[in-house]
Amino acid sequence: MSKVMLLALGTLWLFAAGCARNGVLPAAIPGLERMTDEQKIAYVLEDVWRGMEARRVYQVLAHVSPRYLDQEGRDYTAIQEHVSYIMKAYTSIKITRMRPKIWIAGERARAVETFGTIAAPRDERKDPPINLQGQVMVYLERAGGTWQIVEWGPLQ
């Protein structure tokens, strides 16, 4: 076994031993605990964007609150069905977005997302191609230390 491989295995073993001894990482990951609420919300919105483009329903829904309810009357179950349908009906989803504008008031926040979306349908007879630009308002609440989406819809 090469010296490099032995060094790598030794380092991994020491890391694992440190974790087993304390039950936690031996050192804090730099920056993680110091993220501002605005950065955490921006991360949530970015992860939803990545989930939409990758067509991963559960990556998107991981950030949606069970208390979700939008102006169209969709609750969590309905938004889950809607997102699932979009993922199945379209072969590719490409989203361009600007940095969101975020306002925080205690345990609640709102963000304006400016975006452009292009999506190609699997069956154009059933679903039209999407070429949409605009802005949406996203409302979030802090729950258990994390920010979750409770509504998104048109600007008011």
For each of these PLM feature ranges, what is it?
Residues 20-33, 110, 130-156:
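Short beta-strand edge/turn micro-motifs at domain boundaries
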Residues 85-128:
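Surface-exposed, charged secondary-structure patches
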Residues 1-19:
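Sec-dependent bacterial lipoprotein signal peptides
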